[in-house]
Amino acid sequence: MERTFLAIKPDGVQRGLVGEIIRRFETKGFTLVGLKFLKVSKELAEQHYGVHRERPFFGSLVEFITSSPVVAMVWEGDGVVASARKIIGATNPLTSEPGTIRGDFGINIGRNLIHGSDAPETAQQEIALWFKDEELVNWQPHITPWLHE
């Protein structure tokens, strides 16, 4: 079963949107297998956003993600990476479709509420960076047979 990494960023936590964001993935039928509420260290932030190290916004990105707690999550389900990206919406909330998290709640590109893995390979790397194996729970909700063929 495919897994993805999602993180509700400091703006999503501060605005009280954690429950609403989690609800969207639960009602879609995905299974939550890992959840942490944490203050991100500078080291973790720099590792996570390492691909942007040479970009001019890298410093402000690290500063923002370490400014307040985040909710780190691992979700599981068929096609969860691509589906999560659709639920989240475009990176820039101003171009995100209504009905997406960013389209409904996002304010600007620097405060876009949530991070989601962009590919299955990236998801595996991000999950390994943020979670130890023993922090992930292998379980199946009773409704699973009603969601999958």
Swiss-Prot record:
Keyword Plastid: no
Superkingdom, taxonomy of origin: Bacteria
Keyword Kinase among UniProt keywords: yes
GO biological process: CTP biosynthetic process; GTP biosynthetic process; UTP biosynthetic process
Gene Ontology cellular component terms for the protein in this record: cytoplasm
Catalyses which reaction(s): a 2'-deoxyribonucleoside 5'-diphosphate + ATP = a 2'-deoxyribonucleoside 5'-triphosphate + ADP; a ribonucleoside 5'-diphosphate + ATP = a ribonucleoside 5'-triphosphate + ADP
Cofactor: Mg(2+)
Compartment list: Cytoplasm
Pfam family, one: NDK
EC code: 2.7.4.6
Family statement: Belongs to the NDK family.
Task performed by this protein: Major role in the synthesis of nucleoside triphosphates other than ATP. The ATP gamma phosphate is transferred to the NDP beta phosphate via a ping-pong mechanism, using a phosphorylated active-site intermediate.
Subunit structure: Homotetramer.
Protein name in UniProt: Nucleoside diphosphate kinase
Organism: Nostoc punctiforme (strain ATCC 29133 / PCC 73102)
